[in-house]
């Protein structure tokens, strides 16, 4: 093998290795892609339906309180953190309530469901003392 061929071979291996490492970094840093997601909080539940980008909440208890959901969005392009961009609630009637919100891929979203009040932050859970749960981060 000539010196030039060996150099080309080493360069090709280095390029392949670099692209493999880059692919692994992207794969591990990405949020989950959107699929249907359900959050059960015992008093009711919330579901994100990917086909149509619908957010549905259902109150399953006749306790005088409702089930409240909120969608939070964190843009990849600004550093202001998560913002609540949509709310939906259900309580006191038959069936569930739902609302659409277009989920894109320029940031991450989380859907939070609480019993008795609207969520105020993107990762509220029962372990934090709230009757809430969330989907975790996702996008299209």
Where are these regions (language model features)?
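N-terminal prepro-regions of secreted/extracellular proteins
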Residues: 1-47
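Post-signal peptide N-terminal regions of Sec-secreted extracellular proteins
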Residues: 33-140
